[in-house]
Amino acid sequence: MLAAMIILLTGCGTGSVFDGSRASDASGFRMEYSILNREESADLNLTEGDRLRVSLSHTEGSADVIVGMEGKTPIYRGNGQQNADFVLEIAETGSYHISVSGHQAKGNISFTRISGEIK
């Protein structure tokens, strides 16, 4: 009986690193998770004049977020983010690396490309 309880309790720790869904395509990068305790990333091709809408909503934990082009100063860096909704202006065409590192985070995050093209 004691051995069974020990096995049961050790399976209930905070060892999970990711339980959720993620999607990445030309329009953006989205994740929803009941636990995010690692880094997830995606690359998004953006054009000068585009905007990137960033939305974070966490009911538990937090996330560190970095958005930028390889080898350049990031256009955004936020540590310990819980809830936010803002827009980044894209000043240079290129491939932008988006990195999200969760810390016992539960919630969702999205990065949505808003085209700068005039229609």
Task: Put a short name on every predicted segment.
Residues 37, 48-52, 92-96, 106-107:
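Short tyrosine-centred short linear motifs in exposed loops/low-complexity segments
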Residues 47-48, 55-69, 91:
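Acidic, Ser/Thr/Pro-rich low-complexity intrinsically disordered segments
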Residues 63-64, 100-117:
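Edge beta-strands of jelly-roll/beta-sandwich modules across compartments, strongly enriched
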Residues 43-58, 96-100:
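Hydrophobic beta-strand segments within beta-rich accessory/binding domains
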Residues 1-12:
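Sec-dependent bacterial lipoprotein signal peptides
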Residues 12-43:
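Transition segment at domain starts
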Residues 40-42, 82-88, 96:
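Short strand-edge motifs at loop-to-beta-strand transitions and within beta-strands
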Residues 34, 76-81:
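Short beta-strand segments within Ig-like beta-sandwich modules, predominantly Fibronectin type-III
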